[in-house]
Amino acid sequence: MDSRELYPSDEQRRRIMDFIMAAGETLLENGAEVFRVEQTMEIMARRFHLREFHVYVLTNGIFASAGTAEIAEVRNVPVRTTHLGRVAAVNALSREIAAGGVTLNEAECRLAEARRIPFPKGKTQLLAGMSGTACFALIFGGTIRSALAAAAAGFIVSGYLLLCEERRLSNGFRKISAAALITLVCILGCHLLDTEASHAIIGTLMILTPGIAFTMGIRDFVQGDYLSGTIRMIDALLIAASIAIGTGLVLSLTSLLTGVTVV
């Protein structure tokens, strides 16, 4: 093995550190577990002979150092989305690096490609929202008419969420307003179709529920990472509260204006 690979120069070590941090950031911001991010970064550091590498990952940040702390980096990861295609691409790259079949230049190119993997197209997300909400309405005991109302609400709110994402609106506002929009559309749709609105509302709200955040929080707790688990659980609870606020506002206003309790 080349001694330059075993003992990289200072410039090379900084380049390796930048690559590893970018890989960890890509994993974290696209929905990977905290434990997996740390593990992947450590594997890459060992393979590229970045000695005395230490990393600490939270749900919204990465802290890492190498050597006797002469190389240290901090990355803030405020935005967390879910793109398992990117996570899978980085994991595949990590396995190939561990097997010794990828150079640093190749790894950097592969990582750049992984970070450019696009999200599903808007039309796909609209269709997924429409079909998913209809199925949830049926699962929760709704009728075909309830499912149709839920499908319409799912289509509209999926488009609304895409618009909010483009405008970079805050997550809290997005969830409250989306929940309110869902409730309003379901009430109107079910009124037109002469069916109860509760199953349609519940089925459509499922696309807003923080299932991933809640599950990841529990997994972090189980793995002993209590700080990251607490952050994820609080995030999930805040999203749930936002959904409840948006839904409750519309239901209360509807009851106040019409004198009829929506069921």
Name each model-derived stretch.
Residues 119-198:
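Core alpha-helical transmembrane segments of integral membrane proteins
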Residues 1-102:
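Soluble N-terminal domains of membrane-associated systems
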Residues 1-16, 117, 244-263:
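N-terminal charge/polar-biased segments
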Residues 35, 106-120, 172-173, 198-203:
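Cytosolic regulatory modules rich in charged/polar residues
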Residues 191-263:
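Generic detector of multi-pass transmembrane helix bundles and their immediately adjacent loops
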Residues 79-146, 235-244:
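Alpha-helical transmembrane segments and their cytosolic membrane-interface
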